[in-house]
C-alpha cells in the first residue's frame, strides 16, 4: 500500500517537473539543453531537493508541498539547481571550514539571477532585505557571482547572526551531493566538462541567436561571462558556432581579435 502511494506521488512529481521544464523553456529558450540535462530522481533520504550535476533529486512530499504553494516556487527551485550546475558550483572543492560561506555565496548568486529575470513564471518580488544584500554586494563587486561573494564573506567574516539570517533567506536546495568523488562516465570531471560545454554554447546563443529572449537576463549573462572568461577569436567562434548547427551570416565586426 505504501509503495503504491509512493509511486503515485512520484508520477505526480514527474508531471509537475515536466510542466516546470516546459514553462521555463517557453520563457528561456536559450536554456533548452540545460533544462533537460538532469535526470529526475525521487529520494526519500532528502528533506527537499538537491543535485550532483547528473540528477535533480527531490523528496516527493516536499515537491508536492512546494507545488501547492504555487508553480512559481517549483520553477525557481528547479532552475536554482540548474544554475548551480551551469556555474560549476557543484564541483568546486572547498575545505570543511569554507563550506558555510561557499554554500551561501552560491545561493546568493543564483537567487540574484532569478530575482532579476522579469518573467511571470519566476515572479517572486525580492524583499527589502534581499535588495539591500544585492545593493551592498554590487558596491564592492561589479558582478554578483559565487566566487566573488565567497571572498567578500571571507574578508568580512560577518557576525554569525548575520550569516544565519542570509542562510535563512537564500537557501533553496540542499548541497549535500556536491563535491562527490568518483570515476566513470558519470564522474565529476565528466559532468563538469559537460556542463562547461553547455555553458559555452549558451553564452554564444544568448549573444548571437537569442537577443530578444535574453533581454532582461543581464545578471545571468554577466555570470556566464565571468565563468567563460576567454574572449572569442575568429577560429574559436567558428568552432563553437559549428557545434550549434545553426545557419547565420557571420559579422566579423561583432567580436574582438586578441
Regions from the language model: what does each represent?
Residues 115-258:
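Negatively charged
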Amino acid at each position: 500500500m505504501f509503495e503504491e502511494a509512493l509511486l503515485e506521488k512520484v508520477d505526480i512529481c514527474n508531471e509537475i517537473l515536466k510542466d516546470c521544464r516546459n514553462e521555463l523553456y517557453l520563457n528561456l529558450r536559450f536554456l533548452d539543453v540545460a533544462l533537460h540535462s538532469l535526470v529526475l530522481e525521487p529520494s526519500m533520504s532528502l528533506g527537499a531537493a538537491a543535485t550532483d550535476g547528473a540528477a535533480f533529486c527531490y523528496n516527493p512530499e516536499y515537491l508536492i508541498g512546494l507545488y501547492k504553494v504555487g508553480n512559481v516556487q517549483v520553477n525557481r527551485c528547479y532552475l536554482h539547481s540548474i544554475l548551480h550546475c551551469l556555474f560549476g558550483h557543484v564541483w568546486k572543492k572547498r575545505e570543511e571550514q569554507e563550506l558555510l560561506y561557499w554554500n551561501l555565496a552560491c545561493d546568493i548568486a543564483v537567487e540574484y539571477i532569478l530575482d532579476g529575470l522579469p518573467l511571470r513564471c519566476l515572479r517572486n518580488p525580492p524583499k527589502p532585505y534581499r535588495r539591500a544584500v544585492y545593493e551592498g554586494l554590487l558596491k564592492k563587486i561589479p558582478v554578483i557571482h559565487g566566487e566573488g561573494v565567497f571572498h567578500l564573506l571571507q574578508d568580512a567574516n560577518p557576525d554569525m547572526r548575520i550569516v544565519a539570517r542570509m542562510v535563512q533567506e537564500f537557501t533553496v536546495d540542499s548541497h549535500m551531493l556536491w563535491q562527490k568523488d568518483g570515476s566513470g562516465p558519470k564522474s565529476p570531471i565528466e559532468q563538469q566538462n559537460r556542463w562547461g560545454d553547455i555553458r559555452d554554447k549558451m553564452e554564444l546563443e544568448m549573444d548571437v541567436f537569442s537577443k530578444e529572449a535574453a533581454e532582461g537576463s543581464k545578471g545571468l549573462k554577466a555570470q556566464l561571462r565571468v565563468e567563460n572568461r576567454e574572449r572569442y577569436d575568429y577560429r574559436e567562434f567558428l568552432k563553437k558556432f559549428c557545434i550549434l548547427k545553426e545557419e547565420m551570416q557571420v559579422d566579423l565586426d561583432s567580436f574582438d581579435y586578441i
